[in-house]
From Swiss-Prot:
It catalyses: tRNA(Phe) + L-phenylalanine + ATP = L-phenylalanyl-tRNA(Phe) + AMP + diphosphate + H(+). InterPro entries: aa-tRNA-synth_II (IPR006195), aa-tRNA-synth_II/BPL/LPL (IPR045864), Phe-tRNA-synth_IIc_asu (IPR004529), Phe-tRNA_ligase_II_N (IPR004188), Phe_tRNA_ligase_alpha1_bac (IPR022911), Phenylalanyl-tRNA_Synthase (IPR002319), tRNA-bd_arm (IPR010978). It comes from Francisella tularensis subsp. novicida (strain U112). It comes from the Bacteria. Its cofactor is Mg(2+). Binds 2 magnesium ions per tetramer. Mg(2+) binds at residue 252. Coiled coil: none annotated. This is Phenylalanine--tRNA ligase alpha subunit. Keywords: Aminoacyl-tRNA synthetase, ATP-binding, Cytoplasm, Ligase, Magnesium, Metal-binding, Nucleotide-binding, Protein biosynthesis. Tetramer of two alpha and two beta subunits. Signal peptide: none annotated.
Length: 337
């Protein structure tokens, strides 16, 4: 038993001198490996008298356990030391200036849409959507524009086939809403629309918001009041607004709403063509035939509708003079918003 104790003390003494993990592992193998010195001692048990065997086995196990615990402690110290050295080398200097990141922003059309939707939601309007590939029935027929009607010449339409088009307005959403919902109805229908036109003020695809209100005792005065409040809210100033008689097949009477030029405050400039006024939207009282197409009794209910181009309003709000800039993905332009 004494030789086992001496071997343990020798191994522990060697451990105290270890300076690295490799040497530590060499000592582990030397004493605790398959052919280690303490492991070999276990083979001597078979040669001892029966009363001595348990004593040697117990002594060897105690020595192995003590040595293994010492090795584990030494290994933990080495690993902690390595970690501290690594942390010291890789520490973050919080006094250094941070690295800037490019900050994204909303597209001006999206910002304008959000602004329009926020106003009408605050005034009790729901938001409805419809398909961009629309049937001739919903895009024209139900809106008092039959196939022979000259008003179809007002729309440069993309035809998918004989009965389907890329919608030229979101008015079809109004009919779909009236079909599934009884008055009172208050909705706006934002979305993409398509017309075969492209120049400085027109693109083949643009965004439009149309609105519909159907209820009892609705008047043109209600329409004027709502749109005047909207325009003041959108441009954040008390604007002069005028309504000029106009023509739309789906409303009667119909009007165009003009605002005092936001660029020159009505004094006259290139943007307003020196008239002092800017056309911003169309509106009118819903035609009885359109109400009937939506299964609404025109003898019992009245309604008004309005429509506006989102890009048009965005150009006026942000002072943009070319519609095509919205669709060119030029970061020099987009970063300004």
């Amino acid at each position: 038993m004494q030789i086992v104790e001496q071997m343990k003390d020798k191994a522990l003494a060697e451990l105290n001198l270890v300076k690295d993990k490799k040497t530590l592992d060499d000592i582990r193998v030397k004493y605790l490996g398959k052919k280690g010195e303490l492991t070999e001692m276990m083979k001597l048990i078979a040669t001892l008298p029966n009363d001595e065997k348990p004593k040697l086995g117990q002594a060897v196990n105690i020595a192995k356990q003590a040595l293994q615990e010492a090795i584990n402690l030494k290994l933990a110290n080495f690993e902690e030391q390595e970690l501290n050295e690594k942390l010291a080398q890789e520490k973050i200097d919080i006094t250094l200036s941070g690295v800037g990141q490019n900050q994204g922003s909303l597209h001006p059309v999206t910002k304008t849409l959000n602004r329009i939707e926020a106003f009408f939601k605050q005034n009790g309007f729901a938001i409805e959507f419809g398909p961009e590939i629309e049937s001739d029935y919903y895009n024209f027929e139900t809106l008092n524009i039959p196939s022979h009607h000259p008003a179809r010449a007002m729309h440069d339409t993309f035809y998918i086939d004989e009965t389907h088009v890329l919608r030229t307005h979101t008015s079809g959403v109004q009919i779909r809403t009236m079909e599934k919902q009884q008055p009172p109805i208050r909705i706006i229908a934002p979305g993409r629309v398509y017309r075969c036109d492209s120049d400085i003020t027109h693109t083949p695809m643009f965004h439009q918001v149309e609105g519909l209100l159907v209820d009892k005792d609705v008047s043109f005065a209600d329409l004027k009041g709502l749109l005047h409040a909207f325009l003041n809210s959108f441009f954040e100033k008390d604007l002069k607004v005028r309504f000029r008689p106009s023509y739309f097949p789906f409303t009667e009477p119909s009007a165009e709403a003009d605002i005092e030029c936001v660029m020159c405050d009505g004094k006259g400039c290139r943007v307003c063509k020196h008239t002092g006024w800017l056309e911003v939207l169309g509106c009118g009282m819903v035609h009885p035939k359109v109400l009937k197409a939506g299964n609404v009794d025109p003898e019992k209910y009245q309604g008004f509708a309005f429509g506006m181009g989102v890009e048009r309003l965005s150009m006026l709000r942000y002072g943009i003079d070319d519609l095509r800039m919205f669709f060119e993905n030029d970061l020099r332009f987009l970063k300004q918003f």
